[in-house]
Amino acid sequence: MNPKDLAPFLDLANHHANTTAADIEDICEKVKKYGFNAVFVNQYFVPFAKQKMGPTGKVGTVIAFPLGQDFLEIKIAASKAAAINGADELDVSLNVGLIKEGKWNESFEEMLNIVREVKAIGQKKIVKFILETGYLTDDEIKKTSVLILKSGADFVKTNSGMGPRGVIVRDVELVKEATEGKIKIKVAGGVDTYEEAMALINAGASRIGTSKAVEIITS
C-alpha cells in the first residue's frame, strides 16, 4: 500500500483547546482534498464542520474526552446532542477507574446506555469506546474489548492521544485476539509517519486518528 492509499483509513483530528473556526475550516478542506475518512472536532464545532463538509462528508467528535469520568447522564446527553447536531461518529472515553477497580457491570452498563441512545437517533451513527491502553494491563485491555464488542459498539479505540502513551502494535494485537477480529479497531496517539501507520494496519487496525494525516500520505 502506498502512502496515498492510506487516506480512507485516516481521520484528521483537531482537539486542541485553542481551536478556532478557521482551524476547523482548514482541516475540513484537507479531508475533502485528500479523501480522508472523516474530520474529527470538539463537540462545539460539530455543526460548523458538518456545514463545511456537506451532506456526504463525515464528521466525528469526542465525548467525555479524554478523562472519561463524567456522570453517565452527561455522557449520554453529550452523545445525543452531538449525534443530533450532525456527528456521524462518536469516540467516547471510558471511565478507566471502573476498569481498574474491576467494576465490569457498571462499565458495561455505561456502554450499553450510550450505544442504545445514539443508535436510537440513527442506526448508522458510529460509536467507538476509548480504552486508554497506557493505563491498562493486557488482561484489562482484553476484557474491556470483549465488553465493547458485546455492547453493540462499532469500534474499539485504543487511545485518546492524551494519555500516558500512544498506541503500540501490541495494543491492536490484544484487542484483535480478545474479540476474534469481530469488531473494528481505531488507533490514535503518536501515529505520525507512514511506517507507523502501516505497522498498525498490518496488525489489524482499520482506522487511525491523527493530526498528521497529510504528512502521513505525502511522506
Where are the regions that the model predicts?
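Generic N-terminal amphipathic, Lys/Arg-enriched alpha-helix
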Residues: 1-18, 25-31
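Hydrophobic faces of well-ordered beta-strands that scaffold small-molecule active sites
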Residues: 6-14, 39-41, 57-63, 90-92, ...
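Glycine-rich, proline-tolerant flexible connector loops at the mouths of alpha/beta enzymes
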Residues: 28, 32-48, 65-67, 90-109, ...
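Catalytic cores of alpha/beta
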Residues: 50, 70-81, 136-148, 170, ...
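Surface-exposed amphipathic alpha-helices with a cationic face
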Residues: 50-54, 108, 112-122, 173-180, ...
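Conserved anion-binding
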Residues: 79, 89-154
